[in-house]
Amino acid sequence: MLILTKVNIYMLIIVLWLYGYNFIMSGSQCPMINDDSFTLKRKYQIDSAESTMKMDKKRTKFQNRAKMVKEINQTIRAAQTHYETLKLGYIKFKRMIRTTTLEDIAPSIPNNQKTYKLFSDISAIGKASQNPSKMVYALLLYMFPNLFGDDHRFIRYRMHPMSKIKHKIFSPFKLNLIRILVEERFYNNECRSNKWRIIGTQVDKMLIAESDKYTIDARYNLKPMYRIKGKSEEDTLFIKQMVEQCVTSQELVEKVLKILFRDLFKSGEYKAYRYDDDVENGFIGLDTLKLNIVHDIVEPCMPVRRPVAKILCKEMVNKYFENPLHIIGKNLQECIDFVSE
């Protein structure tokens, strides 16, 4: 009888424990928790529209950055193949001009006058160079003159950036030519990958030191991507794709002008043109329709009121037609003086 009683007691304890567990875990026994008036206060409302919008922005930002890094890595990989091909071609070209004159082979070279000037200029810089790092820096000045203009966009460029988001890289294909020239001048045409990496780091330090002297003026700033709005969704997407490749508003203006007025820059006729007609100074006004396109693309990207943006845009157009910095060769003497110091 005593044993049976103990068993019953144990069974009763188990039943009560299970009932209590179900009572605690069941919402039916605690109507206050299920009541709509009960709100669990949190710092972030997970299901709110505002939170969803923030998450969408973060996701888009991450996707854009991931896409950018992927494209950069693809370009770098393609540049390695380009380096090998370019070096073989450069060595053959050098051998060719030892046995013949440039005048003899000029007809077979596309844009032979520009090619001849480029070869002549970079040879002059190479001959004057006494230090590999200074030679690379001088050739960057020569081949990327538009980056070293008044907007100081070179601040955002590095040869081997620590962050591919914070800094852009110089064109790997132009860097290949610079590398070949340095290997010819200092390393007897031997491929020195490790040495090139060290030189790149030294040049980046020079760029950092020079960057500390300047800032990008506020008038050249661009809006954050999410704040850029065109006249339509299609326009907005197109403008954002243009802006992705730019550091400053001046660079964006230049990019659009080179597309719309390509023939003028290619022929050299750009020298006779300005934003408006200027009979007294002998300048021809640019096509109004094309200028409107420039304004439609550039103004939505500038962090100022539209009337101010229009004035600044006009100034940048005139400035670029006065001195289009994408045309290389104008600063040859500056580059030679730099490597000679």
Swiss-Prot record:
It comes from the Viruses. It is found in: Host cytoplasm; Host nucleus; Membrane. Its main location: host cell. Disulfide bonds: none annotated. Pfam families: BEN (PF10523). Keywords: Early protein, Host cytoplasm, Host nucleus, Host-virus interaction, Inhibition of host innate immune response by virus, Inhibition of host RLR pathway by virus, Membrane, Repeat, Transmembrane, Transmembrane helix, Viral immunoevasion. GO terms for biological process: symbiont-mediated suppression of host innate immune response. The chain crosses the membrane at residues 7-25. It is a single-pass membrane protein. InterPro entries: BEN_domain (IPR018379), Poxvirus_E5R (IPR004334). Residues 112-222, 233-328 form the BEN domain. GO terms for molecular function: DNA binding. GO terms for cellular component: host cell cytoplasm; host cell nucleus; membrane. Induction: Expressed in the early phase of the viral replicative cycle. Interacts with host CGAS; this interaction inhibits CGAS-mediated type I interferon response. Belongs to the orthopoxvirus OPG067 family. Major early protein present in virus factories. The presence of BEN domains suggests a possible role in organization of viral DNA during replication or transcription. Plays an essential role in the inhibition of the cGAS-dependent type I IFN induction in host dendritic cells. Mechanistically, abolishes cGAMP production by triggering host CGAS degradation via a proteasome-dependent mechanism. This is Protein OPG067. It comes from Vaccinia virus (strain Copenhagen). The lineage of its organism: Viruses, Varidnaviria, Bamfordvirae, Nucleocytoviricota, Pokkesviricetes. The gene is OPG067.
